[in-house]
Amino acid sequence: MHVKSIIIDGFKSYAQRTEINGFDPLFNAITGLNGSGKSNILDSICFLLGISNLTQVRASNLQDLVYKNGQAGITKATVSITFDNYDKKQSPLGFEAHDEITVTRQVVIGGRNKYLINGVNANNTRVQDLFCSVGLNVNNPHFLIMQGRITKVLNMKPPEILAMIEEAAGTRMYECKKIAAQKTIEKKEAKLKEIQTILEEEITPTIHKLKEERSSYLEYQKIMREIEHLSRLYVAYQFVCAEETKVRSAEELKEMQDSILKLQDTMAENERKVKELGKEIAELEKMRDQEVGGALRSLEEALSEAQRADTKVQSALDLKKQNMKAEREKKRKELVKSMEEDAKVLTAKEKEVKKITDGLSSLQEASQKDVEAFTSAQQHFNAVSAGLSSNEDGEEATLAGQMMACKNETSKAETEAKQAQMKLKHAQQELKTKQAEVKKMDGGYKKDNEAFEAVKKSKEKLEVEMKKLNYEDGREEQLLEKRRGLSRDVNRLREAYESLMARFPNLQFEYKDPEKNWDSDRVKGLVASLISIKDVSTATALEVVAGGRLYNVVVDTEVTGKKLLEKGELKRRFTIIPLNKISARCLGKDTVNVAKNLVGADNVNLALSLVGYESELQKAMEYVFGTTLVCDTMDNAKKVTFDKRIMTKTVTLGGDTFDPQGTLSGGARSQNASVLVRLQELKDVQDELKAKETELQEVEKELMTLKNTVERYRQLKQQWEMKSEEAELLQTKLQQSSYHKQQEELDSLKQTIEESEETLKNTKEVQKKAEEKFKVLEHKMKNAEAERERELKEAQQKLDTAKKKADASNKKMKEKQQEVDALVLELEELKREQTTYKQQIETVDEAMKAYQEQADSMASEVSKNKEAVKKAQDELAKQKEIIMGHDKEIKTKSSEAGKLRENNNDLQLKIKELEHNISKHKKDSADAAAKVAKMLNDYEWIASEKHLFGQANTAYDFKTNNPKEAGQRLHKLQEKKEKLGRNVNMRAMNMLTQAEERYNDLMKRKRIVENDKSKILTTIEELDQKKNEALNIAWQKVNKDFGSIFSTLLPGANAMLAPPEGQSVLDGLEFKVALGNTWKENLTELSGGQRSLVALSLILAMLLFKPAPIYILDEVDAALDLSHTQNIGQMLRTHFRHSQFIVVSLKDGMFNNANVLFKTKFVDGVSTVARFAQNQNGGSSAGQQRSDKSKTKERRNRMEVDK
């Protein structure tokens, strides 16, 4: 198969339709100037063959292949090649029937890329398979040798050279297919894993589950059948029992009615006898009362009198105690309250007095200063009046004296300046001498000083790092000590908490979570544990108010409560308060205010206001405490409870309860502390425990955080201490060195120089000031009279100003003093009131003591009265015993009458029992009749099978089948049926069949895939072996031709392909070249032309091994000289007689050997092609073809491309 003609339209430089006809079946050459479009012909062939790497056709995308990228009005590129297919041996698969094959490829800008084979649309894969089947794989082309291919072959690595051999041997396609097959196997493997996962995770568990459900379903059916059998037996037995009960009840009813009549007769006889005995006893008692009745009455009257006296004294004692309690609690409380309020005022006044006193002190100091200023101004005025003048220090002196002092200052300054000048000069000379000496000994000191500075910097760096750690030295030890202390506290508090909890088992609400992921916040807890008492004195009252509700459980909703009751496994009975459903009522503010106005605001409170609780618990607390008032005393409670405006239940602090319905409860209470008081103690311990545990956790957390920091800090500190020691040693060494001493002397001299210079400067300033002052004084001396008048006037002004200021300060101070005195008086008054309150409280306490003494005296009187009552009771009892001694006959008759009454009572009980039984039998009889009727109505089979009930050898044989046991069995079976019925899957049988079918189907598909995989792997193994054999044969053949061709092109030389050292042919191949008898280590030892011949020889050897129908060479002779080029051309002509060559070359030696030569030109921006047929000697005929517009139009109808 070879190229016959090419049609190019809009492709690269071929703007117009260009037909290139008359290709020689063997050797064709293309030549032309650079840029004329000769390589574009080869690019068009590659484009048609389906090249994917567009860089090989010098383009970045398909749009670049269109003439001028579509900018010149041409929007598509089309290439059409006609192949000669007369040689059926080289025909592509499936095209043996065609003598010619025309393949067209077209790309449209912004459109799609399409192929046509013989005018029919085809996809890319089909075109690729067509060309690959004849060895024209353009994406791995051994038949295409483009510009630079020789260089590329020279740079190939061993695996790449092996790939060329594989391509020539035809095993490359197998490798590609093998890789594709392996990827397919991997995908199938993934599918197998997916199937296995589905089997393991879905189907198999489903089958197991359905099998279990099938067992449950079969068991359910079995139970249903047994229930049906036992139900009939049990219903038959109940029917028989009901009929027997109906008959038996009627008989027993008649017997009981007869018994009642007999018992009533006996009772009437007993009643008659009791009446007779009563008359006899009354006559005997009348006789007894006449004899001893007077003494008994007098004793009874004495007892009654003693009891009245006892009650009166006891009431007086109770009233005294109550008054004493009210007095102590109310009056003393008021005094203490007033005392505390005054104490607060006293504290505030003391602070105010302190503040004003501080202000007074400031004014006194200011006033004192103003007085001193006034005194000084007065003295100055007096001095000026006397002819004196003030100097700079404020001292009074004459002008002459001041002028003399200025002269002395000037003289003193001149002397000090001369001394400083001499000292400066000496120090400067000494400094120069010492500096020269120091320079000589500078080396060693400098080195030590540098070392000291380096250590100092290291030390500073360590200090910075330590500072960055933000760790305080000893912090870890503090935390460890704190942790030990907190651990002890936590253990102590936990023991105390557990001990207190053990004493209150009723306050523990334990339950099991009713469901998974249960939110414990839904259960708030017991009412007792949810409140806190504001005042401990109210604990008893609050406990009475709450009563049993103190142990109720508060939850968020009724659903939570239901779940707790059903599934919480509570150990005892609890009442539950759901916050969303509880109906709570609370006394209104108006009612509470009425009660407070009635007995005093501090004497009554709503129970709800005396407890603390969370806001979300408002409804529950109103339900428990919202409708009861708490009063301080019984009197106040009574007033509040029965007031018509209030009429509300009230409880006293002592626990006594008053109810508006008229009931009163109270009395002695347990001496043990209130539950709420102990509970408050428990809460305090719990709160403290939580706080300590939180603090301990924070300490633990901080210790964990500090762990790494402490370690790092210790390391840095150790390094810092070492550096500090090193720095101290170096500093000591520096200080002890002679250089250091000399340096100190130098510093001392420098300081002396600075001091001397400063002294010189100061003396000059002093001298200058003194001279200026002398001039001023001299001027004053000359104008003494005018100056004196001016100073006198100024002194008078200063005096007046100072006097005014002193008077004003004194006035302010006095006003402030008065204010302080007033406050001090108030303060003293308040202190006296505090003392008075204390005395009044002591007086109240003494009065309480007197009250207590009176109460003790009254208690003694009560005790005496009780003894008198007891004595009267004893005498009355004795008298009654005497009387009873006379009553034996009465007793006997009374005993007989009593027995008769007891007999009547017993008979009455029997009658009632019989009446009850009659009523019961009537009911049983009616129930049995109704039951029989209902059963006949409900179970239609009873009427037809009634005659079999209880008969032997039937399904209703009650002797063989115990009906009671059948009933128990039936009950158990029904429970089991209910349990199974909730979970049994009625569709289990069908679902199991479907699941098993799906399982079997998947297993079948899995086996098929595994078998296919096994066969593919076996085939790959066999083909790998054949591939290796074919590869060895190809290598040997190519190697032989490679050496032969290279020897021909370069006489005296030899070449071969050999595997790299230590590897096999299957790992790769590399070039081995010998010039003469010397084998070169690598190709770098050869010249450029020799290397090119090596690569070209290999390419030609490949072509000889498995000739492709077409070979394309693009300037492969570019790097060769003319002699080598001519040799190549002759070799192609003489040795390759079975393939078509299309060669692009610029050298005569190459294209003169071609049978047909195509020459390209670039005319008016468009490429054109001319054909020249050449003879054996290289001459050319004039039969050339040009692609012009006229020829294009003539052939367009015949060769137009389907667009």
UniProtKB/Swiss-Prot annotation:
SMART domains xref list: SMC_hinge (SM00968)
Residues in SMC hinge domain copies: 522-640
Biased composition range(s): Low complexity: 1174-1185
Coiled-coil features, chain-numbered ranges: 172-513, 670-1032
Region (Disordered): 1174-1203
Binding of ATP, residues: 32-39
Protein keywords: ATP-binding, Cell cycle, Cell division, Chromosome, Coiled coil, Cytoplasm, DNA condensation, Mitosis, Nucleotide-binding, Nucleus
A single GO molecular function term of this UniProt record: ATP binding
UniProt biased composition (Basic and acidic residues): 1186-1203
Disulfide bonds: none
GO annotation, biological process: cell division; chromosome condensation
Any Gene Ontology CC annotation: chromosome
One Pfam family per UniProt: SMC_hinge
Cellular compartment(s): Nucleus; Cytoplasm; Chromosome
InterPro entries membership: P-loop_NTPase (IPR027417), RecF/RecN/SMC_N (IPR003395), SMC (IPR024704), Smc2_ABC (IPR027120), SMC_hinge (IPR010935), SMC_hinge_sf (IPR036277)
Annotated domain remarks: The SMC hinge domain, which separates the large intramolecular coiled coil regions, allows the heterodimerization with XCAP-C, forming a V-shaped heterodimer.
Matching PANTHER family: STRUCTURAL MAINTENANCE OF CHROMOSOMES PROTEIN 3
Function: Central component of the condensin complex, a complex required for conversion of interphase chromatin into mitotic-like condense chromosomes. The condensin complex probably introduces positive supercoils into relaxed DNA in the presence of type I topoisomerases and converts nicked DNA into positive knotted forms in the presence of type II topoisomerases.
Family label: Belongs to the SMC family. SMC2 subfamily.
Subunit structure: Forms a heterodimer with XCAP-C/SMC4. Component of the condensin complex, which contains the XCAP-E/SMC2 and XCAP-C/SMC4 heterodimer, and three non SMC subunits that probably regulate the complex: XCAP-H/BRRN1, XCAP-D2/CNAP1 and XCAP-G/CAPG.
The protein's name: Structural maintenance of chromosomes protein 2
Organism: Xenopus laevis
Gene that this sequence comes from: smc2
